[in-house]
Amino acid sequence: LYVSGKATALVRQLDGRGLGVRDLSGEIGRASAIKMVYASSTKGAFTLFAAVAVMAELTGLRDELFQELSESQPNTLASIERMLPRIPLDANRWIFEMDEIASTYESLGVTSHFHKGAGDIMQLANRTPLATRTRETAIHDLALTDVLRHYVDAINQNEGQTEKQKPTR
């Protein structure tokens, strides 16, 4: 738990009692800011990996991509395998978080486009049947190919679909 501001002493007493408390000291808002910076990093990476995997599926290059990643970037492949099925479980609330992060980036003069795109990926994930589940009811042994099929089906079922979005195979 991150805390900041002048009145953190009471919360700091919880440190080590089932809770890890990190005092960022300084002005109020630093704790919220680190949460946003961290979330923009983690969820931004998850959504980039999701977009890459879906693109590979749509272009018929999934196997080739996964082979290349297994040889050159095994940690990236492991992240895709771990996170792609999980994104839909929280996507509904993460959509708004991506909007908030994008606005913060924009207010700081940094491009907001990446996290606007991350929000789009969250919306796509939220349209899959996987989004009807929770972390407790998730299907944990679902094959990645099946997960990707759900994402592609959500694209294909989206109203106003353009020719560019249709699978090439």
Regions inferred by a protein language model and the residue ranges of each:
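Generic structural hydrophobic/aromatic packing signal, biased to beta-strands
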Residues: L1, M83, A118, V147-Y151
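Helical "substrate-binding/catalytic lid" subdomain
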Residues: I34-H140
